[in-house]
Amino acid sequence: MASIIKRKKNYSVIYNYVDENGETKQKWETWGTHKEALKRKAEIENQQHTGTFLPPSNQKISDFLYDFVSLYGEKKWGVSMYDSQNSLINNYINPIIGDMEVQAVTPRVVDGYIQTLQKTASVSTKTRKATTTYVSNQTIEKIIKLLRCAFKQAVRWEIIGRNPFDNVVLPKTEYKKRDIWDAEMIRTALDKCIDSKLYVAMNLSFACSLRMGEILGLTWDNVHISEDEIAADNAYVYIDKELTRASKRAIETLGEKDIYHIFTPLLPNTSTRIILKKPKTDSSIRKVWLPKTLAYILCEWKKAQDEIRNFLGDEYQDYNLV
């Protein structure tokens, strides 16, 4: 049961509850009008009667997100996702609403938070420079997606009764149409390229539609360009790795699962590492057929690499990368 007491111009709703330690506590909630207090009193009594009442919690959002990352993120995320999500938390969530109590977040609070984000300066990191003056709508969408997932866990953990980030009205995002190179422009770029390594990478990008991380992570054991395979139009590359940069913290926290190799940094005391890892999704693992022209380019590139390897001997750092 709950009761209402008038205190000067406000009204207090008073009720008892049992905390997580099994101890009975008393809670006072202040409301501006008698109507609001009556509504809250009825809500509490109904929840207590139906067994859906959640005891008050003063847990801060920053503390909750720490638990969320530890209990949820470390099981679900890879190293790249771990870094990006923690970056959003550290740069755009904790500095703005980190000190707010989880149970104090309402849909109206969320709308105000989005407005604040739109006026917040973008943050540059050690590995990525901000490209907009203020937080972009695309980044806001990522932040809300992260918080929606986090608060979904808060509901499951019985910290809150419903997710305030459901049905959020996001700012309209305008996606810029990317310029697409036509065949003539691609041919011009290849003709003017004088760097043999870049020339091979460009051909892989244009002919196979590979992403940069996939090109840099391609290893020779996944390149099938024997004479018989080329003659039968059966030359192909198998994409099952990608090269990316990850923080030492992410690697140490998540372990080396799905990481094939961690490259030794050129400079000491760096906070990140270049790694060779499994792609983010299984759908990214695929076989890509090679046109004969590109297959012959790769053959010549392999010969050039072998000559350098033979010349340098033991000094050649061989990671089997194309």
Specify the residue positions occupied by each region the protein language model found.
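N-terminal core-binding DNA-recognition domain of tyrosine site-specific recombinases/integrases
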Residues: 3, 17, 33, 70-159, ...
